[in-house]
Amino acid sequence: MSVMFDPDTAIYPFPPKPTPLSIDEKAYYREKIKRLLKERNAVMVAHYYTDPEIQQLAEETGGCISDSLEMARFGAKHPASTLLVAGVRFMGETAKILSPEKTILMPTLQVECSLDLGCPVEEFNAFYDAHPDRTVVVYANTSAAVKARADWVVTSSIAVELIDHLDSLGEKIIWAPDKHLGRYVQKQTGGDILCWQGACIVHDEFKTQALTRLQEEYPDAAILVHPESPQAIVDMADAVGSTSQLIAAAKALPHQRLIVATDRGIFYKMQQAVPDKELLEAPTAGEGATCRSCAHCPWMAMNDLQAIAEALEQEGSNHEVHVDERLRERALVPLNRMLDFAATLRG
């Protein structure tokens, strides 16, 4: 595997944490959101990494809690005229690309993703142009502009299957932006992959030594790992997979104690799936090290109840997602390829 462009994730400024709400304030905003969703003919689409109270509200209002692939499917098929996307910006853009006729709202448009930030379109275009013989596969965690230059978009839930398919056709791959997921896929498939060097600030922080000590403390625990984690962490796993695949693994494994190496937002749905099992966070700091994300995406944390209520009430430029139509049409092609390929896997 060849590598290039190594963005420094340490330079990304973290957003300020939302001001904590009182119990009464939370109750007020919950009821307000429920009312506004009905008035606006809107539905919530929330990612597994949002805070538990956001996921709970999506459940209670007939919305969706899922990984980015299922979020895309759900939003495109749901009859609501407005989608409230609780996640990060590329998820809102993806919803708009797939459903241009719908109003796409987000609690704030400043919800970034370190993978997206680490793959600026100008640098990506230069890399793309330097390797015209390669099929371009980009992770869903990219901007609409980067998706528009791709042949395929992929999520972690189908990454191995797609690259295995393309490799069987003799295609050489450009992979962007996550280096850890790219290396995992390359190891699983043996594909010829030229890999961008981005990383998720959450998964990149998991520490091998600290995880080993936790494993020694709980030798009966299984380790579940998202493939955006470093290879040394992946090598310790009893199960590796996307968010939805990790929840399925938690149910399938016989272990009563699980160490989970992904954003702790997943614990809400995972604990529902395995109410009798104990879930432990994989450590993100160790031996003189400190964590920046501490196993929770700081941009996902910006999706709070007050911001959601304001998005539904105010609309406008601070909350509504727009994608240039020409860009949208180009990005739609690889997104539809992803959805069609995923449909063949589901049978």
Swiss-Prot record:
Main EC class the enzyme belongs to: transferase
Signal sequence extent: none
Coiled-coil parts of chain: none
Purpose of the protein: Catalyzes the condensation of iminoaspartate with dihydroxyacetone phosphate to form quinolinate.
Main subcellular localisation: cytoplasm
Annotated residues for binding of iminosuccinate: 47, 68, 139-141, 156, 226-228, 243
Keyword Transferase: yes
Residues annotated for [4Fe-4S] cluster binding in this entry: 113, 200, 297
Subcellular location per the Swiss-Prot or TrEMBL entry: Cytoplasm
Recorded name of the encoding gene: nadA
UniProt-recorded name of the protein: Quinolinate synthase
Cofactor note: Binds 1 [4Fe-4S] cluster per subunit.
EC number: 2.5.1.72
Keywords: 4Fe-4S, Cytoplasm, Iron, Iron-sulfur, Metal-binding, Pyridine nucleotide biosynthesis, Transferase
GO cellular component: cytosol
Classification via Gene3D superfamilies: NadA-like
Family of this protein: Belongs to the quinolinate synthase family. Type 1 subfamily.
GO MF annotations, alphabetized: 4 iron, 4 sulfur cluster binding; metal ion binding; quinolinate synthetase A activity
Cofactor(s) required for function per UniProt: [4Fe-4S] cluster
GO BP term, example: 'de novo' NAD biosynthetic process from L-aspartate
Protein's pathway: Cofactor biosynthesis; NAD(+) biosynthesis; quinolinate from iminoaspartate: step 1/1
Reactions catalysed: iminosuccinate + dihydroxyacetone phosphate = quinolinate + phosphate + 2 H2O + H(+)
